[in-house]
UniProtKB/Swiss-Prot annotation:
One of its GO terms (molecular function) is L-malate dehydrogenase (quinone) activity. This is Probable malate:quinone oxidoreductase. It comes from the Bacteria. Residues 524-553 are annotated as: Disordered. It comes from Burkholderia lata (strain ATCC 17760 / DSM 23089 / LMG 22485 / NCIMB 9086 / R18194 / 383). Its cofactor is FAD. GO terms for biological process: tricarboxylic acid cycle. Disulfide bonds: none annotated. Keywords: FAD, Flavoprotein, Oxidoreductase, Tricarboxylic acid cycle. Its EC number is 1.1.5.4. The keyword Flavoprotein applies. The gene is mqo.
């Protein structure tokens, strides 16, 4: 009998403890702040999604959590990227030469179409007062391709001729004339051997973009809204699924003794740049198991000498050396950062195991697990030229980098230039049923099956296409909402070309160029023949050329 009483007593203690735990848990759940949307990361992607959602569903509550002491301090920061408004006007890796010698322009059309969506999105935000003074974040900067040598000149001419099939590229000019090119970029031609065979394309509709400034203005606007909260110096430590399908996310305030904070969010977006993969893995969603990552950094030579800077107004892209990946493509770039004009040359690849410039040296190790280690090793074998290139880059001396600059700027003086370490770019490695693992280009949206959590992986073309990338994300995770007449009407108001292919209509191209150039205070667009229909389909080729890694700086 005594034994039975002891068992009952023990059982009561256990049940009481369980009841206390349940009560505590219920009280905790009741006290935890509830939000419709949690944005992890304070960069261009999260801020763009925040503005999109505020436009489409202004009654939704949002919280943004950023690990650093301010927004736009990582990859979106103007000093951590080249600020190119990527539209395939100059970047030769978007137009590979196929085995039959023809130039494939399908990727170039896709990239350009995407950037036109970004231009329209920014123009709308200027009209609404969300973005102030367009010159603070976007400026007309001609985009050009510049090559030398018979084979490269031949390639560039074929590229130019192929692109003329699309109205998106008909504002482009081509020249092999020394004097003409000197008019476009005097700094690049002075001191050059006049007998050297060179060629260039020149497109005046190109832009330089300060993505950090766009981010700061977007977040500055969101902070004025009553249902938006920003938490800085906040590092996410836990992401777990609640029984009701929402996500419980906890973070700690760095440099502070404040207790951990948390929210229960109906939807979580992880826009943490290089930190996104680790957080997706921490969430436990099976979709994250398909991915691994490899970090590549970039450095630039920088000059702020006004006598040098005033001689160059262009983003001039070259061609990668034979056997080198596209990330080795150097470019001599005009930049306008916080109102000051400078010139960057690079990038030169660097390596660190960090996934973020302000990350941890353990990032690569922490992201590697039993699910992705085999695909990562497979890519290391298949992409050996990339490994060789990185090894070679790490061995470059200051003289090597300066000699590379002199190929573009023959009269460069060493004392005018300094080396700047830019941001980290994390290349996506995805499990492949046939190859084991493949290196993925571009950005990739990784979302749970129910659409309650999503993250963005990858780099190229990155911030330039934040608006269309976030639009595609919303189509994936808010499919039913996007299909409603209310959202459809609003999206078309923000992006007039939504649902159409500008490539198919020269008249629409001119209309969009004119509208966005006017609102964004850019140079008037070039005149093109609207009566000549597009001869480019923009569809992917049946036998695409082998893709290579792209650092997208």
């Amino acid at each position: 009998m005594k034994k039975g009483s002891a068992v009952i007593k023990t059982l009561r203690v256990i049940l009481s403890a369980l009841a206390l735990c349940v009560a505590t848990s219920s009280a905790h759940a009741a006290d935890t702040k509830k939000v419709d949307v949690l944005l992890v990361g304070g960069g261009i992607m999260s801020s763009t999604l925040g503005v999109w959602l505020h436009e489409l569903q202004p009654d939704w509550s949002m919280t943004m959590v950023e690990r650093l002491d301010g927004v736009a301090l990582e990859s979106s920061n103007g000093w951590n990227n080249a600020g190119t408004g990527h539209s395939a006007l100059a970047e030769l890796n978007y137009t590979p030469e196929k085995a039959d010698g023809k130039i494939d322009i399908s990727k170039a059309i896709e990239i350009n179409e995407s950037f036109q969506i970004s231009r329209q999105f920014w123009a709308w935000q200027v009209k609404q007062g969300v973005l102030k003074n367009p010159h603070s974040f976007i400026n007309s900067t001609p985009h050009m391709s510049f090559v030398w040598g018979d084979d490269n000149v031949r390639f560039l001419k074929k590229r130019y001729e192929a692109l003329q099939a699309s109205p998106l590229f008909r504002g482009m000019q081509y020249s092999e004339d020394y004097d003409q090119i000197k008019q476009w970029v005097p700094l690049m031609m002075e001191g050059r051997d006049p007998k050297q065979k060179v060629a260039a394309t020149w497109t005046p509709i190109g832009t330089d973009v300060n993505f950090g400034e766009i981010t700061r203005q977007f977040v500055g606007y969101l902070k004025t809204q009553p249902n938006f909260t920003l938490s800085l110096s906040s590092e996410v430590r836990e992401i777990s699924r609640n029984a009701d399908g929402t996500w419980h996310v906890s973070w700690v305030k760095l440099h502070s003794d404040e207790p951990a904070q948390s929210v229960d969010a109906k939807f979580v977006f992880i826009g943490a740049g290089g930190g996104a993969l680790h957080l997706l893995q921490a969430s436990g969603v099976p979709e994250a198991k398909d991915y691994g990552a490899f970090p590549v950094g970039g450095s630039f030579l920088v000059t702020e000498n006004p006598e040098v800077v005033k001689q160059h107004l262009a983003k001039a892209y070259g061609k990668a050396s034979v056997g080198s990946p596209p990330m080795s493509v150097p470019h001599l770039d005009t930049r306008i950062i916080d109102g000051k004009k400078i010139i960057l040359f690079g990038p030169f690849a660097t390596f660190s195991t960090k996934f973020l410039k302000n990350g941890s040296y353990f990032d690569l190790l922490k992201s590697t697990n039993t699910h992705n280690v085999a695909p990562m090793m497979r890519v290391g074998v298949d992409e050996f030229p990339l490994v060789q290139y990185l090894a070679g880059q790490l061995m470059l001396s200051d003289d090597d980098r300066f000699n590379a600059l002199k190929e573009y700027f023959p009269n460069a003086k060493k004392e005018d230039w300094r080396l700047w370490q830019a941001g980290q770019r994390v290349q996506i490695i995805k499990r492949d049923p046939v190859k084991g693992g493949v290196l993925k280009l571009g950005t990739e949206i990784v979302a749970s099956q129910d659409g309650s959590i999503a993250g963005l992986l990858g780099a190229s073309p990155g911030a330039s296409t934040a608006a269309p990338i976030m639009l595609n994300l919303m189509k994936k995770v808010f499919k039913d909402k996007v299909a409603t007449p209310e959202w459809q009407q609003k999206i078309r108001q923000i992006v007039p070309s939504y649902g159409t292919k500008l490539n198919d209509s020269p008249a629409k191209v001119v209309e969009e160029w004119t509208y966005t150039s006017d609102v964004l205070q850019l140079s008037p667009p070039p005149k093109i023949d609207v009566n000549t229909p597009s001869q480019a389909t923009g569809t992917a080729p049946a036998r695409p050329a082998k893709a290579s890694a792209d650092m997208a700086l």
